[in-house]
Amino acid sequence: MSFYFKYYRQNLYFEKAIRYDEIYFSSNEELNDPLDLSFTPYFDDNEVAWEKLLQVKPKVEMLNIALYLDTTSYELASELNSIFKGSTLAYQQTIKPLIDSKNKELKRIFIKHINNAIESEYTSDKNSNFSNFDTEAKAEMCILFLTEILSRGWSKKFYSCSFFKNALEPKMWAHYADGFKGCVIIYESNENSSIKLKPHFSSIEYVPYAFSKVQYTNIEKKLSILEYMLNNNIVSSPLLTKNSFWSYEQEYRLLLSEEFNSIHLAQMDKMPTTNSRERIFYHLQESIIGIIFGARCSNDYKDKIRAILGEKRSYIKPKGFYSFDTELTTDGKVVIKSGSICR
């Protein structure tokens, strides 16, 4: 088991966190680092990936481009690779605007390959409901197929909840604990460095969420859309990377992803806006084992918080929790002044 620390200001959110066992997953817009949880989705130079992508089955039969052209064509994969390689997406942008910007090129390529298929008698869609489509309409179906398939490679929004390994970092107390007036909650993890959470207060089932260590480096954060779509991997590295000047934080974080329907995304220019209430999760009561008070935290507030935690811990075993007071030394260090077990 390990211990993780979370800094809080004196406010309603802190009191909700300790009363109701809440934790909140933040979006990029809510974080103090505008580059956090943000990275650049891009198309790498990967003809093999395009060959594989053309074999992916669509969610709607009308978009099955195998009805209209030879999806095994290396030439088609190569041409699509040439059109898209090097392209990037802006943060929160969907695939659709990029597809729209390349509509003429894509239509030209698909019409060529549809005509090639007809001439070579590669395919016959006479038994298809879409056999009466003209060539241009079929090309539009191919573009819609591409939009939907690629949307699967960029269909999520990501959120994080931050914890830390150092409870006595002066900068953290200054920035995140309201100038040493706030508190640090001590959380105990499971044996596999995770914490069990449930998405609703009334839910019964808890799911483990892993504490992941943040890496600090100044490299550009990028993600290959093709690789992500084909491998269906959870994005982790870009979400666990911050610039080096944040290294004093020694952060660990929980990650949450929200996936959107690729059919809907294929018709949208930007990612949907979501309800922040859906990002409040609940942990087990016993996950909180103690509290550390800031050097400028008042005695009245300490008594109030101890009373809240004491009441909650009275219903579980073992009863009690750790309580620590800190002080800020003249040389700028935060040290433990005193501690006790409150029962």
Predicted regions: what they are:
Residues 1-343:
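Partner-binding and oligomerization surfaces adjacent to conserved cores of proteins
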